[in-house]
Every structure is written in structure tokens, then in C-alpha cells.
């Protein structure tokens, strides 16, 4: 038999091979058999003697190891045998078997098959919808982990539940507990009777029937009271809804009024803002004009100060000029007087010079006449008579009124001097 036949397993052949190996021994050692195996999960198909190994469960987030038991006659079987004969696979504490990984059996199905059927159902909301309050009274409250797999989450009643507190009040429960028998599931209205009845219930049927009728009447009265209270609550709820509707309408009316008032106030505020903007612009322009006028005023004041200084300086210069003019006038008058004196003196000198010239000319003419007389004859002075009146008066002084000159005579003198 080749290596492929040795490694292949499952079905009748695997059982036969296991029997042969158990009786006559195996040709392949366990260490060589599992060498170069790709899938470690196939180790469970072969006998390991007393060797236990750890297996990893991928479905659990916290990977834990578990010890497998000694291999038995069912170790070499594959999942087809379980499906063929409707057998359950090996089930460990985690609710998952690595041999049947990928099988159509799920954890829920395995759990439901292995768990016993409850007499009082633990999930009445899913299994028995006709149960109203029986499971709440006789069933132990389940934890969150037990309810995690339910399609409809079970919500236990609170202590302040009005229906349960009204129907199952503390006094009524204590009275039932003090009764000769305990309240069963069948006594609760709306719950189908259980097919399994107890022995003592059969013996005391008539007594319990009478008590049950009495209790049913009490429960009916409680139900009617609850229905009346529910009717009152419905009326109160309608009134409350009407009040809420009226309050909503009033709220909408107030909101519209507030909205309209807001729009009006907003429009008024916008107009006031526009007016404020215009007023601010005018104020700003007036401020600019005021600054310009103040600047002009400051310049005017400075110019006036400069003008006053210039005027004062001009007044001082005017006084100085007037003083200089007076000085110049005085000097001019002095110069005029001096000029007049000099002119008089000059005239006097000129008169003196003229008289001297006249005397010299007279002497010269006399000398010339004497020479002519000596050379040409006598009576020299018979032809020429000189008048000295233009130059000298009787007092031998200058005549300022006679300024006429004999130009021809002077020319003759000049010609005589040049010769």
C-alpha cells in the first residue's frame, strides 16, 4: 500500500486501517506520518497513542488550547458519516469542533439539540406569543449573555411598571403565597395550559377550580379597573395632545408675531443704521472742514503775527529812514549853503581874475601902442577908447547884474595869446 493510501482516511477504510494498525502495528512512525503536513487540523484523524496536543479554535477571539481525549474508533471518520447517519460531532467546552469546521451544523443548532426542552419556555416572546405574564412571574430572570442570541431582545419589567404593579401588587402576591397552593402558569389568563400537569393539581382539581374562578373574577375586576384607568389615561392623553396642539398653534402664532416684529425691528434698525451712517459721514465731513478751517485759522494767526512783526520792523525802518532823510536834508542844506558860499567866492575870484585880465590887457595894449608909436608915428591912442564900465563900477566892485561878455574881444585875446 503506497503513501497516498496510508495517508488517506475516512469511512470504512479508515476503520479497517485503524484495526490493522492496532493489531499488527504500523509501518510509519507518528513523527514521519505528520511531517510535511500542510493542515495541522488533520492530526485528529490519526491515532496518537497517549500523545495529546493543543488545538487552536479560530472562532474564539481568545485562542485557548484544550486537551483531546485518547483516540478511539471514531477518530478516523470524516464529516460525511455524521451527515449520513445524523450523528452529532464531538463537542468541546467552547461549543465548536475543529473536525467539522465548515459543516452546516451551527452552534445554535448543536446547543438546541443538546439542551432539554423547557417545560416553561424561557423565551416566550419568540416561542409562545400568547404568554402574557406567566413567564414573568414563574421564570427566572435571564442574564444579558443568555439573551444575546435572541431575535427579539427580552426587556424585563421595571419595578414601576403600572400594569404589573397594579395587577400583581405586593399584597396580592403575598396572599397567593400564603394560599394552600402556589399560583401555576395555568392560572394566568392568556396562557395556554401546559400539557404536563402535576399529581397534586389533579387531586385538588375541584378546590383549585373554585379558587381559580374566584381569582379569575378578581383578575377580571382588576382588568376592568385597568381598562377604566387606561380609558381615563387615553382621555387625559387626548386632552394632553389637544393642549399640546393648542400650545403648538400658540407657539406658531407667537413665532409668527415675533418674526413679524423681528422683521419690523430689523427694517427699523437698518434705517437707523443708514441714518447713522449718513450722520457719521456728515459729521466726518464737518470734522474735516473744521480741521481745515482750524488749520487756516492757525495759519492766519501766524501770518498776522508775522505781519505785525513786519509792520513793527517797517515802522522802525521808517523812523530810521526819516532820521536819515532829516540828516540828509540837513546835510543838503549845509551843502547848499556851502555851495552858495563857494559860488559867491568863485564869482568874486572870477571878478578879480577878470579885473586882473582887463588890467593886463590894458597894459598890453598900451605897450603895443607904444611900440607902434615908436615905429609908425604918434597919436597912438587916437583910434581906440576902452570902456571899463562892464567890469568895474565907481567903487571898484563887482557888478552882479552885468554878465555880458564881448566874445569877439575875447577871441582876439585868445588869438593874441596863441601868437
Curated annotation (Swiss-Prot):
Residues 229-355 form a coiled coil. The keyword Coiled coil applies. Keywords: Coiled coil, Cytoplasm, Cytoskeleton, Phosphoprotein. Residues 34-48 have a biased composition (Basic and acidic residues). The modification Phosphoserine is found at residues 29, 73, 115. Residues 34-76 are annotated as: Disordered. Its main location: cytoplasm. Residues 64-75 have a biased composition (Low complexity). InterPro entries: Bbp1_C (IPR029330), Bbp1_N (IPR029328). It is found in: Cytoplasm, Cytoskeleton, Microtubule organizing center, Spindle pole body. Belongs to the BBP1 family. This is Spindle pole component BBP1. It comes from Saccharomyces cerevisiae (strain RM11-1a). The gene is BBP1.
